[in-house]
């Protein structure tokens, strides 16, 4: 059974406790691979809240941050968000960069990538293929 998380005053279906002010977004500030490289290697890389560029074996790896939204069952519809990193190829990164500030970027065709963040589930999540749907400027892409 999966616990039902709710920030309302209704008791949890699993533990019967009332959970208030629960975090609705969890995630990492960098891709797992960024966290695995040395400080020296990080000097050659770039990390912003939305993009990571990481030199790797004579090439470059490209990552963007996106959101996986999961519905939360409760008295009021809510959403829990995993803020994760996705590795994209150079062509996809160029397409993302071209439209990043475009007010109509949500109309951009979906792209593909691979999950670059491990999530705490029984089965491994790193490397899973995802479809990236860009949204309006200021909003992380939906995966």
Model-derived regions, located:
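Helix N-cap / beta->alpha transition motif
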Residues: 31, 85-90
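Short, intrinsically disordered terminal segments enriched in charged and Pro/Gly residues
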Residues: 73, 81-84
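C-terminal, charged low-complexity interaction regions
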Residues: 98-143
């Amino acid at each position: 059974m999966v616990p039902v998380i709710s920030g309302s005053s209704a008791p949890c279906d699993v533990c019967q406790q009332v959970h208030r002010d629960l975090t609705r977004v969890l995630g990492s500030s960098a891709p797992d691979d960024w966290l695995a490289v040395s400080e020296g290697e990080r000097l050659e890389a770039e990390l912003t809240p939305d993009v990571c560029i990481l030199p790797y074996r004579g090439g470059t790896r490209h990552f963007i941050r996106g959101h996986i939204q999961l519905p939360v069952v409760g008295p009021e519809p809510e959403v829990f968000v995993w803020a994760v990193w996705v590795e994209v190829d150079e062509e996809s990164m160029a397409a993302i960069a071209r439209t990043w500030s475009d007010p109509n970027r949500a109309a951009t065709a979906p792209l593909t990538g691979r999950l670059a963040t491990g999530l705490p589930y029984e089965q491994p999540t790193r490397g899973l293929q995802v479809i990236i749907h860009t949204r309006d400027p200021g909003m992380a892409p939906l995966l």
